[in-house]
C-alpha cells in the first residue's frame, strides 16, 4: 500500500489530496446513480425515467441510492467527514450544504417542475415538493450514521415516505 508520506509524491499538498477525494467521491456516486438512470446534474434528462414510473419501482430506486449512500465506504466516509467538519470550516459547511442539500433539492425541484408540466404530478409548488421529498431522506441517513442499529427501521420509514409522497402527489392517469 501507499504510505502517508508518499502521498505527497503524487499530490502537491493536503488540499490537492482533499480535492482528489472530493472528485473521486462525486464520480463514484454519479456512476452508481447513472446505473439507476438518475443523473442529479440533469433533471430534464431524467424526466422520461420518472414519467409513468410506478410506486414500487420508485421506492426501490430510492432504497438502492439510500443503501449505496450508507454503505459505499468512500461515499459514507466522506459524508461523515463533511458532517463533522462543517462546524469547523465555513468552506466545508458550504460544500456540505451544496452537495447534500441544495444540489438534491434543486434536482428534484427541476424534475418535479417537468413532471407537473407533463401531468405526472399534481400542480403544486415544485420547490416545496422537493423540500418535502428530500428532507426526510437526509434525516434518515443522518439517523443511520449516528445509530446504525436503526437501519432496518429507517429503511421501512424511507419506503413509507416515498410511497406516501407518490400516492399524495402523483396524478392518476386513466
Predicted regions mapped to residue ranges:
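Amphipathic alpha-helical segments that line or abut small-molecule/effector binding pockets
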Residues: 51-71, 76-84, 127, 131, ...
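Helix-turn-helix
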Residues: 1-24
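Amphipathic alpha-helical packing segments from all-alpha helical-bundle domains
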Residues: 33, 71, 76-83, 90-117
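A short secondary-structure junction motif
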Residues: 28-32, 36, 40, 89, ...
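Hydrophobic/aromatic-rich alpha-helical bundle segments in the mid-to-C-terminal region
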Residues: 94, 98, 102, 112-163
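Residues in soluble alpha-helical coiled-coils and helical-bundle/repeat scaffolds
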Residues: 12-16, 20, 70, 87, ...
Amino acid at each position: 500500500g501507499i504510505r502517508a508520506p508518499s502521498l505527497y509524491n503524487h499530490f502537491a499538498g493536503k488540499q490537492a489530496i482533499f480535492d482528489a477525494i472530493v472528485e473521486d467521491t462525486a464520480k463514484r456516486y454519479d456512476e452508481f446513480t447513472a446505473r439507476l438512470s438518475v443523473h442529479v446534474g440533469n433533471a430534464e434528462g431524467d424526466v422520461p425515467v420518472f414519467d409513468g414510473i410506478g410506486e414500487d419501482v420508485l421506492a426501490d430506486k430510492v432504497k438502492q441510492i439510500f443503501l449505496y449512500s450508507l454503505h459505499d465506504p468512500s461515499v459514507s466516509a466522506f459524508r461523515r467527514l463533511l458532517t463533522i467538519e462543517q462546524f469547523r470550516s465555513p468552506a466545508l459547511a458550504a460544500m456540505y450544504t451544496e452537495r447534500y442539500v441544495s444540489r438534491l433539492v434543486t434536482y428534484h425541484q427541476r424534475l418535479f417542475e417537468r413532471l407537473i408540466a407533463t401531468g405526472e404530478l399534481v400542480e403544486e409548488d415544485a420547490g416545496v415538493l422537493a423540500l418535502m421529498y428530500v428532507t426526510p431522506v437526509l434525516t434518515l441517513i443522518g439517523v443511520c450514521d449516528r445509530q446504525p442499529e436503526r437501519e432496518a427501521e429507517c429503511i421501512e420509514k424511507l419506503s413509507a415516505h416515498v410511497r406516501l409522497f407518490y400516492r399524495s402527489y402523483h396524478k392518476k392517469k386513466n
